[in-house]
Amino acid sequence: MKTIIFFIACLMLIDVVVESKDGYIIEHRGCKYSCFFGTNSWCNTECTLKKGSSGYCAWPACWCYGLPDNVKIFDSNNNKCGK
């Protein structure tokens, strides 16, 4: 029983360490990467270049899945776009 609990605890720890995030990727000025309908492949490329698992155009900006924690994503509370 202790082995099973230890195994489950290890799996939970691995999930915390390998955690990733989803969101709108931002460029150097803090603005979202703009896109238009039909540019899913472009957004997917941009997301995977930032080590995300995938991405698509959630018009009007690129939404990425599985981004590492060090990649900055858009945060409406700390929006610095154009400022």
Curated annotation (Swiss-Prot):
Q: In which tissues is it expressed?
A: Expressed by the venom gland.
Which GO terms label this protein's molecular function in UniProt? sodium channel inhibitor activity; toxin activity
Give every LCN-type CS-alpha/beta domain span. Answer: 21-82
Q: Which GO terms describe its cellular component?
A: extracellular region
Residues of the signal sequence? 1-20
Q: Which cysteines are joined by disulfide bonds?
A: 31-81, 35-57, 43-62, 47-64
Q: Where are the transmembrane segments?
A: none
Residues with the modification Cysteine amide, per the entry, are 81
Q: Which Pfam families match?
A: Toxin_3
Subcellular localization is given as:
Secreted
Q: What is its main location?
A: secreted
Family, as annotated: Belongs to the long (4 C-C) scorpion toxin superfamily. Sodium channel inhibitor family. Beta subfamily.
Q: Cite the domain annotation text.
A: Has the structural arrangement of an alpha-helix connected to antiparallel beta-sheets by disulfide bonds (CS-alpha/beta).
Q: Provide the protein name.
A: Toxin TdNa5
**What organism is the protein native to?**
Tityus discrepans (Venezuelan scorpion)
Instruction: Read off the lineage from the record.
Output: Eukaryota, Metazoa, Ecdysozoa, Arthropoda, Chelicerata
